[in-house]
Amino acid sequence: LTNITTIIHSCSYSLKEPLSPHAAAEIEGITINPDTIKIPNSNHLLVEMAGGLMVPFNNEGYLFSDFLVQHKLPTVLVSRHYLGSINHTLLSVELLKKLKIPLLGIVFVGDEHKTTEAAIKKNANTSNFHRIPITSSLNTSFIEKEALKLKGSSFLKNI
């Protein structure tokens, strides 16, 4: 995002409500058809799916995890510390393993929580971890600072 070669592709669906896609789409009176979502041809591509692997795209039972399988997309999980985050993160790791979706690493968001992270690291199917802080303003300065930390890191080399 901080260089001239980064391309931000348009969203196939842009929903107004901060809800799961199936719920937001229903409010807006549209149906999400995952087959209309085209994956751009790119050397480096990040597809963001907020909410979790079991979040439905639509009311037809098509989940984010189905999309990952269909398009053979390896995954980086994002984990934020809260009561239940160990369980949620490790359940996601297990689902990825069951569906044979490669887990490239886990990014922890927020302050370090040693016991939580130790439990996840011990039981996750990866040894590739990274941390980014929580920010109140996602801007170019924040992105540049975090990108510099990531550049050359073992996390990036392993994905």
Write out the residue ranges for each language-model feature.
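Class I SAM-dependent methyltransferase SAM-binding "motif I" and its flanking Rossmann-like core
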Residues: 85
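A general structural detector for well-ordered alpha-helical segments in enzyme core domains, enriched
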Residues: 36-37, 63-67, 92, 116, ...
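Switch II (G3) loop of P-loop NTPases
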Residues: 36-59
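N-terminal phosphate/diphosphate-binding loop that engages ATP/GTP or pyrophosphate donors
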Residues: 1-30
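Inter-motif core of Ras-like GTPase G domains
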Residues: 58-82
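Structural motif
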Residues: 46-48, 76-78, 107
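C-terminal lobe/tail of nucleotide-utilizing enzymes
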Residues: 93-159
